[in-house]
Curated annotation (Swiss-Prot):
Name of the coding gene: RPL10
Recorded GO MF terms: structural constituent of ribosome
Domain of life per record: Eukaryota
Protein's recorded name: Large ribosomal subunit protein uL16
Subunit annotation: Component of the small ribosomal subunit. Mature ribosomes consist of a small (40S) and a large (60S) subunit. The 40S subunit contains about 33 different proteins and 1 molecule of RNA (18S). The 60S subunit contains about 49 different proteins and 3 molecules of RNA (25S, 5.8S and 5S).
Keywords: Ribonucleoprotein, Ribosomal protein
């Protein structure tokens, strides 16, 4: 029996059905790697980020996520170099898709029960995405901006529905706007923590006491 088309599982019709002690025998997700490229370089290296954003509420299979990751990764290696980017898949397939197998050969009417007990068995995994949710993000240096847009465009061909490519206003994968990053770093308002940053806030009695004495 062939694999059921992904269009059968495209829409979010019911509640999420994750793997649990009641839902056993779930096959492994096809996608196992969510970060590609220079994933260990810190936040200072790649200031520019582009997102592939979903414009529909739908389910995306783990096979499609893996195909999109491979497509974008190969294009970036070929056109920008393997040390010039960092790709991150932003959604994870936790929803279990079920199938009620039906025999279609001659004489099958004596072997199957039709819709009696039709709950189905686990068949695959999918990610449930909402409108405006990023599916994939790539951070690079400014000279590779055109290559990133083309890579995300090719990755979008692997997904159903509508997606848009958007340029992030943040520096890399951080939560600091690009125009503030260099200034805040010189002022010591945050410290670099891998691909992200840790904002240093004044809190606690010691800082409060210093402000009172200064006043």
């Amino acid at each position: 029996m062939g694999r059921r088309p992904a269009k059968c599982y495209r829409y979010c019709k019911n509640k999420a059905y994750p793997k649990s002690r009641y839902c056993r025998g779930v096959p492994e997700a096809k996608i196992r790697i969510y970060d590609c490229g220079m994933r260990k370089l810190n936040a200072d290296t790649f200031p520019l980020t582009y997102h592939l954003i979903s414009m529909e509420r739908e389910q995306i299979g783990s096979e499609a996520l893996e195909a999109a990751r491979i497509n974008a990764n190969k294009y970036m290696i070929k056109n920008a170099g393997k040390e010039a980017y960092h790709i991150r898949v932003r959604v994870h397939p936790f929803h279990v898709c079920r199938i009620n197998k039906m025999l279609s050969c001659a004489g099958a009417d004596r072997l199957q029960q039709g819709m009696r007990g039709a709950f189905g068995k686990p068949n695959g995994l999918a990610a449930r995405v909402r409108i405006g949710q990023p599916l994939m993000s790539i951070r690079v240096k400014p000279q590779h901006e055109a290559v990133v847009v083309a890579a995300l465009k090719r990755a979008s061909y692997k997904f159903a529905g509508r997606q848009v490519i958007a340029k992030s206003t943040m520096w890399g994968f951080t939560e600091i706007r690009s125009e503030n990053y260099v200034k805040w770093k010189e002022e010591g308002k945050f410290r670099v923590d891998g691909v992200s940053t840790k904002i240093l806030r004044n809190r606690g009695r010691l800082h409060r006491a210093k402000r009172v004495r200064a006043a």
